[in-house]
């Protein structure tokens, strides 16, 4: 082996390995202190790009879960208020049935009407004041709004909150009253016992209800027979013996037409009026009877929307479960790419520390090699 002074190859080699060991040690310390094995693009360019995309997705999923929970909270708030609306309507129905009883005097019916009016005011107050985050929910101003329940655009679900005020047309319908009142001596005549009711239902289908009453039936029995043949309209009789037919706006679209022998004899079709829970009047037998049909239509409308809100809440609960599952898997994938394996990294750091110490020792010895040339000069 040649002995030279100008170039110490052994020292250069030891220096190179020392630098490598120190660099590896610094990398291990950075990974252990940060908790990430990718701290810059130079560590793993592709891994950094993938982990950043996964991080964006994870953050979006977190926001989506919060949005879905807000949607559930809004639905719960609205549904809770509507539960009280249902209770009020049921009480109003009880009072209407009570007022329809023949044992009540005019004064008693007026007293019942006072409670009905107070309940109606409270129903409207609930609709006007129920809110979430300053947004009114049940007075018809909320409408349909979208809830972002995904990590990307285009993953929204619509929620519509309907008007629960008592003057909303869906909280009532149209009342048709016969022009001619029939007393207890009136009976359905043979040959004039047919009544055809033509209408369009809420699904847009044209319907014809053919009533063939039994000859000899009185006006109350006729109303009972009509109610037994269909649930699209409700028939009742007022205190003057006039037949009343109510068509709820939640069941019937547009006008109802009447034809047949009974239609002509009773004078059905010309006298009609729009009625809602806000207009019910139980101070008369006819008004009380009609009020029952109006409130039944309102209850169906409210309960139908409550069912929609219940389905919305269940859907969002499942959406949250799915989002949590996706987020868990996304974070697991990101962790495998970016997070430090402490067991592996501490082993690597120990190795680099040992190599650094060994390289330092060898470098010190390599630096002494040129001194051997002095002994040759004697």
UniProtKB/Swiss-Prot annotation:
Single GO MF descriptor: structural molecule activity
Role noted for this protein: Flagellin is the subunit protein which polymerizes to form the filaments of bacterial flagella. FlaB/D is not essential for polar flagellar synthesis and swimming motility. Homomer of FlaB/D is not able to form a functional filament.
Gene3D superfamilies: 2.60.40.4390, 6.10.280.190, f41 fragment of flagellin, N-terminal domain, Flagellar export chaperone, C-terminal domain
Protein localization: Secreted; Bacterial flagellum
PANTHER family listed in its UniProt record: FLAGELLIN
Family per record: Belongs to the bacterial flagellin family.
InterPro entries for this protein: Flagellin (IPR001492), Flagellin_C (IPR046358), Flagellin_C_sub2 (IPR042187), Flagellin_hook_IN_motif (IPR010810), Flagellin_N (IPR001029)
Name by which UniProt lists this protein: Polar flagellin B/D
Coiled-coil region(s): 103-128, 311-340
Pfam families to which the protein is assigned, alphabetical: Flagellin_C (PF00700), Flagellin_IN (PF07196), Flagellin_N (PF00669)
A GO CC term assigned to this protein in UniProt: bacterial-type flagellum
Keywords in alphabetical order: Bacterial flagellum, Coiled coil, Secreted
Summary of subunit composition and partner proteins: Heteromer of multiple flagellin subunits including FlaA, FlaB/D, FlaC, FlaE and FlaF.
Miscellaneous section: V.parahaemolyticus possesses two flagellar systems: a single polar flagellum propels the bacterium in liquid (swimming), while multiple lateral (peritrichous) flagella move the bacterium over surfaces (swarming). The polar flagellum is synthesized constitutively but lateral flagella are produced only under conditions in which the polar flagellum is not functional.
The UniProt record lists the keyword Transcription: no
Main localization, broad class: secreted
Keyword Secreted: yes
Signal peptide: none
The organism of origin for this protein: Vibrio parahaemolyticus serotype O3:K6 (strain RIMD 2210633)
């Amino acid at each position: 082996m040649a002995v030279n002074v100008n170039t110490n190859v052994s020292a250069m080699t030891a220096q190179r390995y020392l630098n490598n060991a120190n660099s590896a040690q610094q990398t291990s310390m950075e990974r252990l202190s940060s908790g990430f094995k990718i701290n810059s693009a130079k560590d793993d360019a592709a891994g950094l790009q993938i982990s950043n995309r996964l991080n964006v997705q994870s953050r979006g999923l977190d926001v989506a879960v919060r949005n879905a929970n807000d949607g559930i909270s809004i639905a719960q708030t609205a549904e809770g208020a509507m539960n009280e609306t249902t209770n009020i309507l049921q009480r109003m129905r009880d009072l209407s049935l009570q007022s329809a009883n023949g044992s009540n005097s005019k004064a008693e019916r007026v007293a019942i009407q006072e409670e009905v009016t107070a309940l109606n005011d409270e129903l409207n107050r609930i609709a006007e004041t129920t809110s979430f985050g300053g947004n009114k929910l049940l007075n018809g101003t909320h409408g349909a709004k979208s809830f972002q329940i995904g990590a990307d655009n285009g993953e929204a679900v619509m929620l519509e909150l309907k008007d629960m005020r008592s003057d909303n047309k869906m909280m009532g319908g149209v009342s048709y009253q016969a022009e001619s009142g029939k007393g207890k001596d009136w009976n359905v005549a043979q040959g004039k016992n047919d009544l055809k009711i033509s209408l369009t239902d809420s699904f847009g289908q044209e319907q014809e209800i053919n009533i063939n009453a039994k000859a000899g039936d009185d006006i109350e029995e006729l109303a009972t027979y009509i109610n037994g043949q269909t649930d699209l309209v409700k028939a009742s009789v007022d205190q003057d013996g006039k037949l009343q037919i109510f068509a709820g706006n939640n069941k019937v679209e547009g006008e109802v037409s009447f034809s047949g022998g009974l239609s002509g004899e009773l004078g059905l079709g010309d006298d009609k009026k729009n009625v809602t829970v806000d207009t019910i009047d139980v101070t008369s037998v006819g008004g009380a009877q009609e009020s029952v049909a109006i409130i039944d239509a309102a209850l169906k409308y409210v309960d139908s929307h409550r069912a929609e809100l219940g389905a919305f809440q269940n859907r969002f609960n499942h959406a949250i479960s799915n989002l949590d599952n996706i987020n868990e898997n996304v974070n697991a994938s990101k962790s495998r790419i970016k997070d430090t394996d402490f067991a592996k990294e501490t082993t690597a750091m120990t190795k680099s520390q040992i190599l650094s110490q060994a390289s330092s020792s060898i470098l010190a010895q390599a630096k002494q090699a040129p001194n051997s040339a002095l002994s040759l000069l004697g």
